[in-house]
Amino acid sequence: MSADKKEPSFRESVDLMFNRAVALMDLSPGLEEKIRVCNATYTVRFGVRLRGQIQTFTGYRSVHSEHMDPVKGGIRYAMAVNQDEVEALAALMTFKCAVVEVPCGGSKGGLRIDPREWEEDELELITRRFAYELAKRDLIHPSQNVPAPDMGTGEREMAWMADQYRRMNTTDINSRACVTGKPVNAGGIQGRTAATG
């Protein structure tokens, strides 16, 4: 890369890949832009009392496409999480699901946090509060938006999120299906035990 030309951001790289694919297709007017953009991105900021003070956290959940319900995509915990990243990852989830004919739209979420900086009980409080903020907006829901583990999260975090959803939706008989990647003893299924990263 030359000194006068900056490297594209992750989001810009996804758009460049999309542009190359679209150039090979005959899409009706307006459809290209509809496919390119995310339907919605939600930013949540919440506080949790930890270590004698209120700690404020920022999280995101982006829904790229709801052409098929539910939407599906991981939740990551990392200090570099931002809106552009979750929107790009949500778009990639839509494309991946479409290519392999999984009947789901794409979504992705993240919490700007270094999970290694927190004790397990603190991380549980943070995760449950994040899940609460998402669930009250139907951004965790078995028939609408189903998160999964991603970088910095795993079975433990998915179990906490599923339990928080269940506590908020006591009459939902499908509450265990609100996330995937849970441990078997929390309603998960045999299979992958590690997430991306």
Regions found by a protein language model. Name each.
Residues 1-196:
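N-terminal ligand-binding/catalytic initiation module
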